[in-house]
């Protein structure tokens, strides 16, 4: 067995420490230089000793107690193994039932570190939920709010991750069961107390928000609307000659992009996010086409005979002839734009009118189970109306003309609603004829419009929770 000795493997310690040829030997990190050569082990075993420290049986020479044991770092795992009398076996091997007893994160299916916020969860999801409930929760899903949340993709979409946290039962008052030694009755009582305190806190916070909203001046409210304005969206202009498919493809792509920005715009309106989620979504579902159209009119107000869909998509009436049934809608849009031009619509007036369209859009009863949200909505409508009256008064025209101007602006909203219904019917027709595919948020908005038309009564809250694009 001479060929297995450390001398053959250059692990021997040179006697002459001044010799330059032995420098590399002294720098070796192999701990075998400190022990006598186990003649019955192969060179491969000597080079794999770090893994064998946990894999060999206790009878292995590597597990014998030696004077140089303190050279190894003493860690918590090392002490645990020594206490269990198995210094060379892995924790899993020493406890065959550990895998069976392991818990998994209810959100991402990773190994759970404990019982956090009412469910078993990992450290990552626990920290994410903690950040979210402390105020950092203005997340928007860039897709269809159906992203897969697992160990590898949990960071890809914060909105869907937070939605899943709530779906699996995470809550602010969740107790850590593994650290709780109380009886079940006491745990329930503590939970009820916590929920009661949370309810009182939420009610107090709501009153504070209402007071703050009522004290906001019309000027401050209009400035907030100005800051909430979404950016211009670009879309590639279809190449000529225009076809029905290419034109509709450009328009639907533009609408889908604008819908994403519309959600962010609505959430920035003071008081909107204080409404119930049910009411927020119903309002947006009811007015999205109107908001898109009045934005189109505002962009086109200084361009007679043109419709400025986007900075890089400018169309006139004749260019719409390639799409069946769209000329009637183009004529309505051009006529309303001309009327706004005659009234010399100001930018701040446009901001207030657009917010009014959103807040006054639902023709169905809002959440019957949350009358508080309905009351907030009416209060918010009064705030927007006051802001519009203030903007008109700031123009300097006489009081009688101010009343007339307010009436003229409000009367145009019914025409915007009529054009919106025509546009919705046309888009549904194009979709049913397979002229253009409709995806993502635009598709869900269309489906919601169709379902609402087929229903005689508004949706119930549990059913509606399936529509989750606006979950934060």
Curated annotation (Swiss-Prot):
Q: What is its main location?
A: nucleus
Localization, per the record, is: Nucleus
Q: What is this protein called?
A: Estrogen receptor beta
Source organism phylogeny: Eukaryota, Metazoa, Chordata, Craniata, Vertebrata
Q: Which GO terms describe its biological process?
A: cellular response to estradiol stimulus; estrogen receptor signaling pathway; regulation of transcription by RNA polymerase II
Provide the assembly information: Binds DNA as a homodimer. Can form a heterodimer with ER-alpha.
Q: What does this protein do?
A: Binds estrogens with an affinity similar to that of ER-alpha, and activates expression of reporter genes containing estrogen response elements (ERE) in an estrogen-dependent manner.
DNA-binding region, residue range(s): 105-170
The record, for SMART domains, names: HOLI, ZnF_C4
This protein's GO CC annotations? chromatin; nucleus
Domain of life here?
Answer: Eukaryota
Q: Does the keyword Transcription apply?
A: yes
- Domains (record comment): Composed of three domains: a modulating N-terminal domain, a DNA-binding domain and a C-terminal ligand-binding domain.
Q: In what residue span(s) does the NR LBD domain sit?
A: 217-449
Q: Which CDD domains match?
A: NR_DBD_ER, NR_LBD_ER
